[in-house]
């Protein structure tokens, strides 16, 4: 299967890996839709699929989170979002928590970082570098800074942005290509290497 809207080999490789493993769906049978904005619901759905869709329920959802648009019969990401709240990947104090919020760099790094920690991966970063980066970027939480540093040191985000660019563009929305690339590198570099150890 080759999606007709993907021209770059880099995007093709990550998309095909994620698609063939059942982690992500295309926009149509022959187009991926990579330039569309990545959404929180889809992002956590990919993580949920990587985790083999564990059983979940809505007990951890914040009050009034369920709506006509977001419920078990109306939203394809319902189970994934419920699971993300139960697992602590999404938290009520986070900046972007609605299933239809656009993903940005800081949210992507934060969710990947939390997922890696939940999966037993070593998420330590250099503490002095973290303190310095927090001082230089006071608009970012300490956890977001550590998440961005960890995603950079593990090469999850470096093909897209160097660390300085990542910090400067922390609130820039990412598209489905970027989402797929980040999660592809999480799978192939971190999760697979841990499973092989």
What are these regions (language model features)?
Residues 22:
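Phosphate/pyrophosphate-binding loop motifs in nucleotide- or prenyl diphosphate-using proteins
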Residues 19, 85-86, 152:
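Alpha-helix C-terminal capping/helix-coil junction sites
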Residues 176-178, 183:
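Non-catalytic cell-wall polysaccharide-engagement segments
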Residues 1-12, 25-44, 49-78, 86-105, ...:
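Feature responds to low-complexity, polar/acidic, surface-exposed segments characteristic
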């Amino acid at each position: 299967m080759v999606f007709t809207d993907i021209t770059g080999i880099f995007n093709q490789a990550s998309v095909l890996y994620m698609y063939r493993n059942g982690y992500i769906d295309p926009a149509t049978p022959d187009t991926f839709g990579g330039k569309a904005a990545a959404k929180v619901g889809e992002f956590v759905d990919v993580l949920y699929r990587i985790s083999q869709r564990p059983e979940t329920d809505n007990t951890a959802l914040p009050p009034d989170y369920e709506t006509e648009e977001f419920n078990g019969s109306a939203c394809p990401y319902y189970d994934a979002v419920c699971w993300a709240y139960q697992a602590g990947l999404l938290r009520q104090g986070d900046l972007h928590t609605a299933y239809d919020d656009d993903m940005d760099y800081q949210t992507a790094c934060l969710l990947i970082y939390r997922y890696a920690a939940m999966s037993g991966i070593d998420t330590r970063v250099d503490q002095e570098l973290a303190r310095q980066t927090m001082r230089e970027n006071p608009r970012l939480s300490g956890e977001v800074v550590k998440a961005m540093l960890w995603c950079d040191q593990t090469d999850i985000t470096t093909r897209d942005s160097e660390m300085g660019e990542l910090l400067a563009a922390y609130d820039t929305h990412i598209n489905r290509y970027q989402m797929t690339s980040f999660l592809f590198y999480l799978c192939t570099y971190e999760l697979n290497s841990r499973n092989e150890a």
